[in-house]
Regions:
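Cap/insert and terminal regions of metallo-dependent hydrolase folds
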Residues: 147-211
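Active-site metal-binding motif and surrounding structural segment of the metallo-beta-lactamase
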Residues: 35-80, 157
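Active-site glycine- and acidic-residue-rich loops that bind
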Residues: 138-150
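A short helix->loop->beta-strand "cap" motif at the edges of active sites that frequently abuts
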Residues: 24, 74-77, 204-210
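Active-site neighborhood of phospho(di)ester-bond hydrolases with catalytic His/Asp-centered motifs
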Residues: 28-31, 51-59, 79-82, 137-141, ...
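Metallo-beta-lactamase
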Residues: 80-133
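Conserved beta-strand hairpin/beta-sheet module of binuclear metal-dependent hydrolase folds
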Residues: 1-44, 124-141, 158
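Structured catalytic core of nucleotide-sugar glycosyltransferases
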Residues: 6-17, 57-67, 72, 85-86, ...
Length: 211
């Protein structure tokens, strides 16, 4: 039994990743409408009622806008930190709140570790899934990488990480300067070069796939 990662969608229109381990199925982020999630899961021959839980990285709409409807319509447990739960107006009686660097266990040997990452206006985390000696990570929407993140992702067999823009194209583009500064700042997103530098610090012979 191993961990598998399937990206149901990424980008400003919505993000969600299906993580499977044996009979367990967990989503990282749910930035889609209920109807759209049903459609994307159907491609995997799955229904929302088969999902064991949804982990939310942060409250921005493209990552968490579908959490409340998933909670209400299908009763899927939502796992997030306090700030994210408040921003998404989740039912706290049905929401599992976590603290960074405290493992979230879905089975005896299948867990997720939330690792804090910098992102503007959000209490954002990356997630490291583990099963036995196997580990896989999802890190999105971070303006810079930290040594703490390097420590937890080094040697992961699978890494999903953003590479959001080319610096030259960004600064030569037509965006307002203020927006360019926000995108490239510590609270924005990783550039292609930053992601490359990060990966040079975490990839080992054990790493099998990078998305």
């Amino acid at each position: 039994m191993s961990i598998s990662f399937t990206h149901l969608g990424t980008g400003s229109r919505g993000n969600s990743t299906l993580v499977e381990c044996g009979d367990h199925k967990v989503l990282v982020d749910q930035g889609f409408s209920g109807k759209e999630l049903e459609k994307r899961l159907a491609r995997m021959e799955l229904k929302p009622t088969e999902i064991d839980g949804i982990l939310i990285t942060h409250h921005h709409g493209d990552h968490g806008s579908g959490a409340a409807i998933s909670q209400k319509r299908w009763g899927i447990p939502i796992f997030c930190n306090d700030r994210t739960a408040s921003a998404l107006n989740l039912d706290l009686s049905k929401t599992h709140l976590f603290e960074s660097l405290e493992a979230i266990e879905f089975a005896e040997d299948f867990a997720f570790l939330p690792v804090p990452v910098p992102h503007s206006g959000a209490d954002n985390v990356a997630f490291v899934a583990s099963h036995g000696g196997e580990r896989g990570a999802i890190a999105t929407d971070l303006g810079s990488w930290t040594e703490e993140l390097v420590t937890h992702l080094r040697g992961c067999q699978h890494i999903s990480i953003e590479a959001n823009y080319d610096q030259k194209r960004l600064w030569n583009g037509k965006y307002p300067v203020r927006l360019k500064e926000r995108i490239s700042g510590r609270g924005g997103h990783l550039s292609n070069d930053q992601t490359g530098a990060f990966l040079s610090n975490v990839v080992t012979p054990e790493t099998r796939s990078i998305v």
